[in-house]
Amino acid sequence: MSGRGKQGGKARAKAKSRSSRAGLQFPVGRVHRLLRKGNYAERVGAGAPVYLAAVLEYLTAEILELAGNAARDNKKTRIIPRHLQLAIRNDEELNKLLGKVTIAQGGVLPNIQAVLLPKKTDSHKAKAK
């Protein structure tokens, strides 16, 4: 009985997400939806969400790498906002990118002005002799 349904056709291939096609962890489909709903442009090309998801993934990985190093330096196994703050503010490019951003519970960078430090004198050496 030809012409009745899809009995003779090929089995449909397993669905593959656009993120996995691009080799990304960030959701390309969600980024595409947000670009469309955000009224940034009338139309959104197919490559734009892939590129944007890749950029966001790269920036996230970079920040997490530096924050992980900051956590390890402080002998901690969990990244907290303080580690994110230290990572971003100690990196010149990330600090410029996120210069106006306030990180809650981030604290400040340790910094003592040179004028306030005690003066280095030879008084200790003179008293020893």
UniProtKB/Swiss-Prot annotation:
Entry-annotated residues carrying N6-(2-hydroxyisobutyryl)lysine: K6, K10, K37, K75, K76, K96, K119
Record cross-link Glycyl lysine isopeptide (Lys-Gly) (interchain with G-Cter in ubiquitin), residues: K14, K16, K120
Chief localisation class: nucleus
Ranges where the record places region Disordered: 1-22
Modified residues (N6-succinyllysine): K10, K96
InterPro entries reported in the protein's UniProt record: Histone-fold, Histone_H2A, Histone_H2A/H2B/H3, Histone_H2A_C, Histone_H2A_CS
Subcellular location, record wording: Nucleus; Chromosome
Any one GO MF annotation of this record: structural constituent of chromatin
Name the record gives this protein: Histone H2A-IV
